[in-house]
């Protein structure tokens, strides 16, 4: 997922560790290579149905679970999540949360088993690196760019069980297996890392809910 200088640096470090320093080689599964941050304790079980219902009712949720992502995209562990059916959510994220230009698009995260019903593309996109035309833009306008495209991410239960279960619950409620997914940070900030970062973000940014390793904060 780190297609650039950052990925080259990680590759060089792994090569040095294995080939020069004789460290054992670790075989990463494909879904593991994008979550290379520090591991944090899961404080409690997540009430996926409750969080999904809040999103369906219009809440913007700061979502922190597991290791943080490596690479240029938020891939479901350090994300701001919202309902893609409501155009107002894109405006609110741009104007109030991110404080950036009104026209900036947001990416969707979609269940892999359903992505071809919603996006005109032939292969999964687990690292949010591909852009495709949206097949049903009238149903998910908040993630559809002005040219009808969207840079989407697909997710499986094996790849990210927490975000997968949340989207499953959202689909049960709405019939839509898609969420807005954008990086968990405010204007001029890096993506959040620690639980303390998440609590501070919730206290200072007008999101409706934060889910921090199972702990729920809400207004």
For each feature predicted by the language model, list its residue ranges.
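Flexible beta->alpha loop and helix N-cap segments adjacent to enzyme active/binding sites
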Residues: 1-219
């Amino acid at each position: 997922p780190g297609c650039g200088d950052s990925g080259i640096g990680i590759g060089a470090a792994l090569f040095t560790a294995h080939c020069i320093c004789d460290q054992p080689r670790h075989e990463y599964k494909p879904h593991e290579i994008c979550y290379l941050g520090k591991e944090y304790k899961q404080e409690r079980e997540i009430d996926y149905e409750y969080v999904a219902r809040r999103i369906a009712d219009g809440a913007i949720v700061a979502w922190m679970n597991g290791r943080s992502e490596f690479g240029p995209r938020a891939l479901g562990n350090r994300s701001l999540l919202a309902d893609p059916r409501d155009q107002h959510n894109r405006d609110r994220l741009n104007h109030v949360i991110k404080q950036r230009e009104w026209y900036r698009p947001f990416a969707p995260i979609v269940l892999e088993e359903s992505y071809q019903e919603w996006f005109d593309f032939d292969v999964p996109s687990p690292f949010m690196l591909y852009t495709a035309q949206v097949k049903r833009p009238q149903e998910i306008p908040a993630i559809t760019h002005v040219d009808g495209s969207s840079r989407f991410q697909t997710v499986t239960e094996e790849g990210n069980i927490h975000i997968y279960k949340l989207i499953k619950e959202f689909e049960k409620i709405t019939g839509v297996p898609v969420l807005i997914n954008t990086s968990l940070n405010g204007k001029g900030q890096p993506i959040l890392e620690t639980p303390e970062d998440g609590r501070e973000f919730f206290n200072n940014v007008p999101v409706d809910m934060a889910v921090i390793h199972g702990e729920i904060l809400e207004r």
